[in-house]
């Protein structure tokens, strides 16, 4: 069974750069405290690392 990540948006992207806004949107997050579950792949890890100051990540 592959690992999954539960990603939660904790801070707003208002005031962030365009790249940060698009990265959060690409993860499937729109609202604060919204959570999504994604496969633990290098691409997802890279997106999470880019906006880690806005997110909380847990392994599921």
UniProtKB/Swiss-Prot annotation:
GO molecular function per UniProt: structural constituent of ribosome
GO cellular component: cytosolic large ribosomal subunit
Pfam families xrefs: Ribosomal_L30
GO biological process: translation
Keyword tRNA-binding: no
Ribonucleoprotein as UniProt keyword: yes
Keywords, sorted A to Z: Ribonucleoprotein, Ribosomal protein
InterPro entries associated with the record: Ribo_uL30_ferredoxin-like_sf (IPR036919), Ribosomal_uL30_bac-type (IPR005996), Ribosomal_uL30_ferredoxin-like (IPR016082)
UniProt similarity note: Belongs to the universal ribosomal protein uL30 family.
Complex and partners: Part of the 50S ribosomal subunit.
UniProt name for this protein: Large ribosomal subunit protein uL30
């Amino acid at each position: 069974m592959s690992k999954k990540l539960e990603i939660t948006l904790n801070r707003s992207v208002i005031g962030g750069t365009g790249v940060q806004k698009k990265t959060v949107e690409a993860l499937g997050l729109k609202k604060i405290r919204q959570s999504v579950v994604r496969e633990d792949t290098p691409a997802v890890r890279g997106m999470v690392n880019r906006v880690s100051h806005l997110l909380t990540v847990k392994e599921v």
